Amino acid sequence: MILSSSLRPTILVVGDLMIDHYIWGECERISPEAPVQVIDVKRETKTLGGACNVMSNLIALEASVLSCGVVGEDLAGRELLGFLQELGMESKGIITQKGRPTTQKSRIIASNQQVVRVDWENKSPISEESEEAMIAYIRSKLSLCDAVILSDYGKGVLTPRVCQTIIQMAKTLQKRVLVDPKGRDYSKYRGASLLTPNKKEAKEATGIEINDEASLKKALECLKKECELEFSVITLSEDGIGIFDQALERIPTIAQEVYDVTGAGDTVIASLAYGLSLGYPLRECALFANAAAAVVVGKIGSATATHGEIAEYLHSSHQGESQERILSRDSIQKIAKQWRSRGRKIVFTNGCFDILHAGHVQYLQKAKACGDCLIVGLNSDASVRRLKGELRPINSQEDRALVLSGLEAVDYVVVFDEETPYELIRAIEPDVLVKGGDYEGKEVVGSDLVKEVKLIEFLEGRSTSAVVKKIQGS
């Protein structure tokens, strides 16, 4: 799982800035004037919406955020700037355009259900003067950013000129541009790093009805090719997230209760940008974004998800205990760096763990007690065969990794193919290296790379070889 990092990526968010206005009340009667509900208002609230909600999500993830967009000379515009100031954000990139209203969406909520929405907005393209001012600001800030998000709600801010200018400038500086798109014509996004349309939006853009894995792959490939993307992503609501890098993968949804899907797309693109800016692979970023979205849809209104909420949600829903803990070498190296930055003690051990038994479990429990985070290096199938012979392993590396990742003592599992874990230890840089008591008086591989080596006695009479012999004997 992507952890809170001492490294704070700087992300520029450009798009349609909005105010989300909520009127909360109760409904107990029908109007005598017309067959409509009467809402007894109890309170009202205003929050940041649209591209501003993307910013709020990034701030909740502890990223540094720069903003760029257009507001009107009105109360909603002044309120929006005030909300951003409360979040500690500067507003130099926000342009005020005379005669143009600030977008505000008013929602009436009764008994935790949305009854109706009223919109104040102007969807026409912004003026050339506003375009020029936005581009000038972005040009001055882009070199300071790790990534750019274009949050398009179709309100006229992200014109073809603005989009293409940003994408070309970002390419020159080797910065990623992530787009939450709107409309049928995606040509203005061509050359971006990735798009995050939902299933309906993807169908409108590609003409492909997504109803199975084959059509999902076709739509993702179409978007990647036609828009010249680095990756393609489609959000699938209750079916999770579909991603395509070199191959298709669908990340299943983990939402338990859905109260309001408002702003879930904002959470997804913010989480993807955050993870990619820290150097995580797309798959892990999608897993993280999926979990963040699950937190958000369990709240009313445009909401955000913190690292703590995401971790708690994954733990309570028993998700990520397997797929989130089995990592590549590159990913575990980044995660180990994050643990160290938080002052945590990293423990490493390794082995084949072919047929898991009580001796293994006790050994791993004692290893975990040596620090805060236990990383297990698991010999690949090829590595086990070289060590144990052609009849081993009994269980595949995928099965062995999954079983290990389900143990409470194990934080992460990473498979290695070499005969020894030396290079893996070098990459992780653990504080403590743990081996079995049978290494007493022997050289421990990787001992020169760590501060401390701990030898732990195995539970007597328990071994995989003994289990295999017992099975063969029966």
UniProtKB/Swiss-Prot annotation:
Residues 348-474 are annotated as: Cytidylyltransferase. It comes from the Bacteria. Disulfide bonds: none annotated. It catalyses: D-glycero-beta-D-manno-heptose 7-phosphate + ATP = D-glycero-beta-D-manno-heptose 1,7-bisphosphate + ADP + H(+); D-glycero-beta-D-manno-heptose 1-phosphate + ATP + H(+) = ADP-D-glycero-beta-D-manno-heptose + diphosphate. Transmembrane segments: none annotated. One of its GO terms (molecular function) is heptose 7-phosphate kinase activity. Residues 1-321 are annotated as: Ribokinase. Keywords: ATP-binding, Carbohydrate metabolism, Kinase, Multifunctional enzyme, Nucleotide-binding, Nucleotidyltransferase, Transferase. The active site is at D266. In the N-terminal section; belongs to the carbohydrate kinase PfkB family. This is Bifunctional protein HldE. The gene is hldE.
